[in-house]
Amino acid sequence: MSQKFLFIDRDGTIIAEPPTDYQVDRLDKLALEPDVIPALLALQKADYKLVMITNQDGLGTSSFPQETFDPPHNLMMQILTSQGINFEQILICPHLPEDNCTCRKPKTALVESYLADGVMNSATSYVIGDRETDLQLAENMGISGLRYQRDGLNWTQIAKQLTQRDRHAYVNRVTKETAIDVNVWLDREGGSKIKTGVGFFDHMLDQIATHGGFRMDIQVSGDLYIDDHHTVEDTALALGEAINIALGDKRGIGRFGFVLPMDECLARCALDISGRPHLEYKAEFNYQRVGDLSTEMVEHFFRSLSYAMACTLHLKTKGRNDHHRVESLFKVFGRTLRQAIRVEGNTLPSSKGVL
């Protein structure tokens, strides 16, 4: 699998660039840009490999002797390394613009090895720098560029932009009985729009989204003139598939979740996003319907959902009121799902290496 890389400029991006001569040639000129260390640590944790690429005009000549460049550069590297920041390579072009070399940014000679097939994931790699030449380099490499600005797109914002996930999936399911559109955003909250034609079922699905801490839009056209069976079943299948797709490779998720009490009922839920579908369910109801939802379809919903989502799900509730018992199951599932889909790191939560 190709790797995601960050190609990062030095002067004006990692360290401050002196406005007078644009050369960091003394120790007293060395100053890190604000928040660069925590940002680079966060980016490393998100599995980015770091490459420093910098133009150093006339390095090694009388205008910029190597012996004046090395002390501040080496100190910068010592500071970064001491904080756990590791650069795969330090790429330096020492030439002047008039030298017409092939390695000066925005030309790509220094990064040719990364442009070979299968080395770099171009969709998830970036050039980060404070100059237009950095953005031109990104364009020449076929990747995206980010223009660093201390008072604009700063390191805190860059780290947030590149590490914050927006897990989304869309599923369209059409059968002879139903037509269903499901959108799921696991990293957004609020604003869910749900219309299945079964009012109480809409309310229950909203409980999953609200207590699960994510957003979903569900639009259903079903054969309700017969009953609610196909509408509930197919919605569960489409929703489970959408959640499963949105989870992606499941890297970094909590995977497990469990909750006990809910309302005056005692509702229990244990969840493992394991890739192995299974449902254990125990609930009894006094009546055949709650509102316009058949109570027998509650178990069928969760069974269909668990199989489409490829998860192991244990659900149980006790109580006196059917409305509360049904609602407790949807609420407790939502709260449990919130724990399981939360991103807690960047490793796959399985000793098998796959979920």
Swiss-Prot record:
The Enzyme Commission number assigned here is: 3.1.3.15, 4.2.1.19
GO molecular function per UniProt: histidinol-phosphatase activity; imidazoleglycerol-phosphate dehydratase activity; metal ion binding
Active-site positions, per UniProt? D9 (nucleophile), D11 (proton donor)
The reactions it catalyses are: D-erythro-1-(imidazol-4-yl)glycerol 3-phosphate = 3-(imidazol-4-yl)-2-oxopropyl phosphate + H2O; L-histidinol phosphate + H2O = L-histidinol + phosphate
Binding residues annotated for Mg(2+), in chain numbering: D9, D11, D130
Q: Where does it primarily localize?
A: cytoplasm
List of residues binding Zn(2+): C93, H95, C101, C103
Short name of one Pfam family: IGPD
Part of which pathway?
Amino-acid biosynthesis; L-histidine biosynthesis; L-histidine from 5-phospho-alpha-D-ribose 1-diphosphate: step 6/9; Amino-acid biosynthesis; L-histidine biosynthesis; L-histidine from 5-phospho-alpha-D-ribose 1-diphosphate: step 8/9
Residue ranges for the region (Histidinol-phosphatase) are 1-166
The cross-references to InterPro entries, in alphabetical order and at most eight, read: HAD-like_sf, HAD-SF_hydro_IIIA, HAD_sf, His_synth_bifunc_HisB, HisB_N, Histidinol-phos, IGPD_sf, ImidazoleglycerolP_deHydtase
> Would the keyword Cytoplasm turn up in this protein's UniProt record?
yes
Q: Which cofactor does it need?
A: Mg(2+); Zn(2+)
- Similarity-based family: In the N-terminal section; belongs to the histidinol-phosphatase family. In the C-terminal section; belongs to the imidazoleglycerol-phosphate dehydratase family.
Kindly give the HAMAP family that the UniProt entry links to this protein: Bifunc_HisB (MF_01022), HisB (MF_00076)
What is the protein name given in its UniProt record?
Histidine biosynthesis bifunctional protein HisB
